[in-house]
Amino acid sequence: MLTETALDQVVGSPEVLRGQLEHLLGLGARDDVTVQVVPRSVPNNPVLGEGLITLDFGAAAPRIAFKGSHAPATYYDHEEGTTPMFRAMDRLRELASSPEESVVLLSEKLRGVQ
């Protein structure tokens, strides 16, 4: 899951951005990866300005979450910390474009890279 705004950020060069978009499209074509884009028009992004990683291992291990930005990441491994993080990720998933819509958006962005 990534924001549309992130897709517009040229870091390095347009060639780097083109490679990143191609890589995301390749990942989205895999059966074991889901790529979703949160459109810039979506209000109230629950993780705006920070990263969020959630890991759910089922019965094998407790759920964990990482939250971070430019400072050291915060690691959550207890239910009282992970529950809000998983709720935020669920909400983000609801707000994001479908995987199919995201492929269309990524393709449009790729065509627009100068």
Predicted regions and their residues:
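Hydrophobic protein-protein interaction segments
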Residues: 1-114
